[in-house]
């Protein structure tokens, strides 16, 4: 659920009272992952990867509005955006901000990274 929808449901005052954060994937990994998903599960999907990237389908893959407000010029409305490429460090930053121990065992599935490198 996009951050703006959560803010609308709980109210701006409550939303602003919490540390709101999200984690973002490498955009190429997201695009390739979505492309492979459509190829596998949508029988009517027959675009090449090049066609997919040039089409409007690309917007669905990017999920840009998840942490922005589309009614306010796509302004970022979360307090922190972490990145999967820096997952361990970024989780430690969030944990420190909320007063929890910063050590966490993080295991990342790297198959998506390999996929986009092979396709590109």
From Swiss-Prot:
Family annotation (InterPro entries): P-loop_NTPase
Domain of life of the native organism: Archaea
Q: Which SUPFAM superfamilies match?
A: P-loop containing nucleoside triphosphate hydrolases (SSF52540)
Identify this protein by name: Uncharacterized protein AF_0604
Tell me which species this is from. Answer: Archaeoglobus fulgidus (strain ATCC 49558 / DSM 4304 / JCM 9628 / NBRC 100126 / VC-16)
């Amino acid at each position: 659920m996009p951050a703006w929808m959560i803010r609308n449901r709980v109210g701006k005052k409550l939303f602003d009272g919490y540390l709101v954060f999200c984690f973002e994937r490498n955009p190429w990994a997201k695009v390739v992952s979505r492309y492979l998903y459509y190829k596998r599960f949508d029988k009517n999907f027959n675009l090449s990867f090049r066609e997919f990237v040039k089409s409007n389908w690309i917007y669905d893959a990017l999920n840009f509005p998840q942490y922005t407000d589309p009614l306010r010029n796509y302004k970022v409305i979360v307090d922190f955006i972490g990145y999967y490429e820096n997952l361990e460090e970024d989780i430690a930053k969030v944990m420190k901000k909320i007063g929890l121990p910063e050590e966490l065992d993080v295991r990342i599935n790297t198959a998506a990274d390999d996929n986009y490198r092979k396709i590109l």
